[in-house]
Amino acid sequence: MATSRLPAVPEETTILMAKEELEALRTAFESGDIPQAASRLRELLANSETTRLEVGVTGESGAGKSSLINALRGLGAEDPGAALTGVVETTMQPSPYPHPQFPDVTLWDLPGAGSPGCSADKYLKQVDFGRYDFFLLVSPRRCGAVELPPSLLRSCARGRSFTLCAPRWTRIWRPPAARGPRVSARLQLLQEIRDHCTERLRVAGVNDPRIFLVSNLSPTRYDFPMLVTTWEHDLPAHRRHAGLLSLPDISLEALQKKKDMLQEQVLKTALVSGVIQALPVPGLAAAYDDALLIRSLRGYHRSFGLDDDSLAKLAEQVGKQAGDLRSVIRSPLANEVSPETVLRLYSQSSDGAMRVARAFERGIPVSARWWPGVSASARSTPCSRAVSMRWLRTPNASASKPWRKMSPRGVR
């Protein structure tokens, strides 16, 4: 049976790292201590994979905060671990809801403004304001008078990152005949509500607020994709990895962003692989490299939503059968990644080591000049990273096929 040719890895791939990461690696390489450098690289990789992200979700009582949290976590109200929902305020104290697939990301359901036992003047202290990396402020319907704690609005006005969401605006949607065709009327209504919310927040002292009109029941429509993009943009660089992976795959653009970010992570992993090879311990490099590759491939499988639960939820959202979506997936990562899968991928890789080595030298040029041994090991061993780079494209392409099959139409 013929083996399909793997897509080539681009020649101009570069390892992107934060300034502090580069300085730490420079110090480790200059010391000439291989075990120290290997330990430092493993630490940097682990930190990027386990960075915590805390998101506070607050707003008016009964505004739909819990439903929005469930939508962002890809859960329905009846799913195990879902946030409690109801027509009245159900949150009396900050309640953490870890992401079901990425436990380092936690969305906090905060008490609504005006809820019993939560006074407006002490709101920041009661919800532990400093805990959160940024806020989602939820307001129902037309945003009214934006009934949010003044202290919270003032803190946001001073630069605290936040986004306002209106998840229940669809309840006021009625396409009057006088406004023309349905699509035109809906677009006009969307803009009217955005303008109204913007003006109310400016009156409250918030300059240039971001407004997103979303539907908790239809996370693929309206402003939800723009909310996802803003989430990624607002996160600090060191928390972007966790934040982006945790977001639901609600568009082809979201899938592409995940692929780009994971591609950078692959090349960081290549550094670890190359330095481990330089350690004088027989068999260590091969064993570590295999384990690292298996973990990476399993991460891609989970991140792109190719597991059964994720496909079932996506099918439910768009009114399709899960089997129809799975039928278009052609990735070997559509099933659980095993050591046998890794061996098969290794056998299909022939020229990855030199390309990863070139990316290694472009990202950390000090290694080639100051530590020839590590540079040589980077050329000879990271075949697994070439496998990762190539097969990272495969699940990304597979994950996009269900979206293309759905072919959503109308106003997004």
Curated annotation (Swiss-Prot):
Residue span(s) of domain IRG-type G: 51-234
Modified residues (Phosphoserine): S246, S303
GO biological process: positive regulation of flagellated sperm motility
Subcellular location field: Cell projection, Cilium, Flagellum; Lipid droplet
Enzyme class: hydrolase
Residues where GTP binds: 60-67, 85-89, 215-217
Annotated GO MF terms: GTP binding; GTPase activity
Matches recorded under InterPro entries: G_IRG_dom, Immunity-related_GTPase-like, IRG, P-loop_NTPase
Gene inactivation effect: Knockout mice show no overt abnormalities, however male mice show reduced fertility. Reduced length of spermatozoa tails and significantly lower motility. Reduced ability to penetrate the zona pellucida likely due to impaired sperm motility. Spermatozoa show disorganized fibrous sheath, loss of thickening of the longitudinal columns adjacent to doublet microtubules 3 and 8, additionally ribs that circumferentially connect longitudinal columns are torn, this phenotype is first evident in step 16 spermatids.
Record Gene3D superfamilies: P-loop containing nucleotide triphosphate hydrolases
EC number assigned by the record: 3.6.5.-
Keyword Membrane on entry: no
Nucleotide-binding keyword on record: yes
Known tissue expression: Expressed in spermatozoa tails from the testis and epididymis, where it may be a component of the fibrous sheath (at protein level).
PROSITE patterns given in the database record: G_IRG
A GO term from the CC aspect: sperm mitochondrial sheath
Keywords noted in UniProt: Cell projection, Cilium, Flagellum, GTP-binding, Hydrolase, Lipid droplet, Nucleotide-binding, Phosphoprotein
Reaction(s) catalysed by this chain's protein: GTP + H2O = GDP + phosphate + H(+)
Predominant subcellular localization, coarse grouping: other
Protein family according to the UniProt entry: Belongs to the TRAFAC class dynamin-like GTPase superfamily. IRG family.
Subunit structure as annotated in this protein's UniProt entry: Interacts with PLIN2/ADRP and COX4I1/COXIV.
Protein role: Required for sperm motility and therefore male fertility, via positive regulation of spermatozoa fibrous sheath formation.
Record PANTHER family: INTERFERON-INDUCIBLE GTPASE (PTHR32341), INTERFERON-INDUCIBLE GTPASE 5 (PTHR32341:SF10)
Name of protein: Interferon-inducible GTPase 5
Gene that this polypeptide is encoded by: Irgc
